[in-house]
Structures are given as structure tokens and as C-alpha cells.
């Protein structure tokens, strides 16, 4: 019997902790610069999430956002992703891949 993939709309604390642990090993994939979140950055983020499911993003100096938390909210909304962690100028987001999901949440 095939397992059906259910769409995750919110992460539990156990799932967030698991993803935070996996994110420690991941390099920064996206950099948000002075232009902010532009269509090209959204495309790169979309492709990265499909390939990796879990990506780390860094807010560069001069970015038009007050905090990484604000940028995380905007990017998550545009990418239909879920925030995992936000520390300093970096944050981690997660979205299950539509095909070939690599990360099994607890």
C-alpha cells in the first residue's frame, strides 16, 4: 500500500527540533541583499526547496528588512514554506518536496 503525503501546515516542537538538528550541517543557500526578496531570489528559493526541502537563508547587510524574522515571514509566504528557526541574521525554512521527499518528519 502506498503512503499518502499529507501537507504539513504547521510544525510541532518535536518536528522543529528535528529540522534544527538537520539544518546545523547545511550551508547557507540563499542570501537576501539590498534589493530584498526579488522574483529571481524566489525562483532560486523554490528550486532549492524542491531539491533540499530544508534551506538556510542569510540576511545581508543593507537588506530592506528590520530583522531576519520579518524577512523569514515574507519569504515563507512567497515560497509556501514553514519557518523552522531564526537566529541573528540567518533563518531556516522547510517545505516538503512534491516529488521524492527526502526528509521524513517524526
Model feature map: region roles:
Residues 1-106:
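Positively charged, polar, low-complexity stretches
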